[in-house]
Regions:
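Signature for HUH/AEP ssDNA processing cores
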Residues: 116-176
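Histidine-centered divalent-metal-coordination microenvironment in nucleic-acid enzymes
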Residues: 174-198
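Structured loops at beta-to-helix junctions and adjacent beta-edge loops in soluble globular domains
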Residues: 135-137, 180, 268
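Catalytic "initiation/cleavage/transfer" segments centered on a nucleophilic residue
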Residues: 35-41, 48-74, 94-125, 197-287
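A short, flexible beta-alpha/helix-coil linker loop
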Residues: 139-143, 194-199
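Extended repeat-based interaction scaffolds and adjacent low-complexity, acidic/S/T/P-biased segments
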Residues: 1-85
Length: 287
């Protein structure tokens, strides 16, 4: 695969939303639309489930009866469809897109509430817990060769290792993960691991060892961000909001900060982090 699937899907979504909001036909409208359709056709998989706006392109592909390899010919055929007609078609899918986004936000709120409940229970059960956070992604130079099936497969392997408590995962008392898609990061995962505080103390070291496992799973295409690096932790320590690392049950501020910090797992800074494609409708993005 030579196309960056993640970036293309975000570009298509932004394009459809832009066209939907236009008052008049933009310059090179048919050329841009034909280019995106051809690129989308190159990555399209009929077995996949596409989010919201992307479904508009799926329907257009089904209707077009010429070879999508010729952009000029496709642009000519698209000119038989007026800008207003295509804009109305997009409007239908944008409405569905907005409904799905509302459903997504509701699901995020539910996931957040469940995770907070689980972590509150853990913090009450143990006198101290070690909360480890890291982000797993792919090196930018490999984004063009990693599609949603690769990401799903890599995550399945990692989750199985966690579930089996192999190696560094031995002794886990709680864990959570969230799959996302971003403009810069591409496909990525926020990972939370929780250990008994009297058995483990080095959160940074654990995150580093997990990153090595991720690199092996991804054949060295994977990269990571260790949330326990001193530079990253210092900014939260200075603000008195540090909520990862060693958390003591008898310190209400630490527990409170921890419960706030873990919400980032399913509530990223930007709302546009949802997956635009899944290998199937029931593909899990949180657990």
């Amino acid at each position: 695969m030579n196309t960056n699937e993640s970036a293309l899907l975000i570009e298509i979504e932004n394009y459809i939303l832009e066209i939907y909001n236009r008052k008049s036909k933009p310059k090179d409208f048919y050329d841009d639309l034909s280019r995106l359709l051809i690129e989308f056709n190159g990555i399209y998989n009929s077995d996949y489930s596409y989010f919201g706006c992307i479904e508009a392109f799926v329907e257009l592909l089904r209707e077009l009866n010429i070879c999508l390899g010729c952009q000029g010919e496709l642009a000519q055929q698209l000119k038989n469809l007026s800008f207003k007609y295509i804009q109305c078609r997009f409007e239908f899918y944008v409405s569905r897109h907005k409904r799905k986004l509302r459903d997504h936000r509701y699901s995020e709120n539910e996931n957040t509430a469940q995770l907070v409940k689980r972590m509150r229970t853990v913090s009450q059960r143990y006198s101290r817990i070690l909360v480890v956070r890291l982000d797993l992604a792919y090196k930018k130079k490999y984004h063009h060769s990693v599609d949603i099936a690769d990401f799903d497969n890599d995550m399945r392997i990692l989750r199985q290792r966690i579930h089996n408590q192999d190696g560094i995962f031995k002794g886990l008392i709680e864990y959570a993960w969230a799959l996302e898609q971003g403009t810069e990061k591409g496909y990525h995962c926020h990972l939370l691991l929780v250990y008994k505080g009297h058995e483990h103390k080095n959160a940074y070291g654990i995150a580093e060892r997990v990153s090595e496992i991720w690199k092996k799973i991804t054949f060295n295409q994977g990269c990571y961000f260790n949330c326990h690096s001193p530079e990253y932790l210092n900014q939260f320590e200075e603000q008195g909001t540090l909520g990862i690392g060693m958390i003591h049950r008898n310190d209400p501020d630490q527990v409170g900060n921890m419960l706030k910090a873990i919400q980032y797992l399913v509530r990223p800074e930007k709302e546009e982090q949802y997956l635009r494609v899944k290998v199937c409708k029931r593909m899990r993005t949180f657990g």
